[in-house]
Design a protein with these regions (language model features):
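A secondary-structure boundary/capping signal
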Residues: 23, 28, 43-45, 76, ...
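A broad, low-amplitude sensor of folded, mature protein cores
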Residues: 25, 58-67, 71, 155, ...
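Conserved catalytic scaffold of divalent metal-dependent phosphoesterases
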Residues: 31-34, 49, 111-192, 196-200
Length: 204
């Protein structure tokens, strides 16, 4: 039995297309109560399917994520680099659909996603990912909740944080690490960013 104190982030990254790693971060905060304590969150980003990642790699990532039985899964943007044919779209959708999370799967869009936005949105929504486009979501766990704020590539912080109660633990996710300068850390406890192709984490 794995007993975790606080929230645990499993950050799935890769050094090169053949070397996937899992980095574990354990978060402690007085905003995490008994109900939200022990949540496991899996974060992955920058798939760039067809450029860096093929079908075999997708299976490896799927196994690494599902191995930890995450409560929440977050995708940090850049799903693929060029329009997918039907066969590749089916393979990518199969991978995303196979990911399992008790309290939901969430995504933000990256710069590459904006080039093929309708296809990306269709794939993500059809595989049960909720896209946070300068929006936030309350994730309820046994009557308590944490905030998840999603910033797109043109971050609109006012809209993204609308209604966020800073008394509750708040995650911000952004594809661009540069959005860090725009975030109000009086309302943010933890931020995750992609785009660097090896993930970035910021704890204020």
């Amino acid at each position: 039995i794995l007993i975790l104190v606080g929230l645990t982030i499993y950050n799935i990254t890769y050094v090169n297309p053949y070397d996937f790693t899992v980095r574990k971060e354990t978060i402690k905060s007085n905003k995490i109560d008994d109900n939200t304590n022990g949540l496991i969150i899996a974060y992955f980003s920058d798939i760039h399917y067809g450029t860096f990642i093929n079908e075999k790699h997708l299976k490896t990532i799927e196994e690494k994520i599902n191995k930890f039985d995450p409560d929440i899964i977050i995708f940090g943007g850049d799903l693929f680099d060029s329009a997918l044919n039907g066969n590749d779209q089916s393979k990518l959708s199969e991978f995303l659909r196979a990911l399992e999370a008790k309290y939901g799967k969430y995504a933000i869009l990256g710069d590459k996603d904006n080039e093929y936005i309708e296809q990306v949105k269709s794939i993500l929504t059809d595989t049960d990912f909720r896209i946070l486009d300068n929006q936030n979501e309350k994730i309820y766990v046994n009557g308590s909740y944490i905030n998840l704020v999603g910033l797109n590539t043109n971050a609109d912080v006012i809209n993204a944080y609308d209604g966020v109660n800073p008394s509750n633990f708040t995650f911000a996710i952004s594809h661009y690490p540069d959005n860090l300068d725009k975030v109000d850390f009086t309302k943010t406890d933890y931020m995750l960013a992609g785009h660097s192709l090896n993930g970035q984490v910021y704890i204020p």
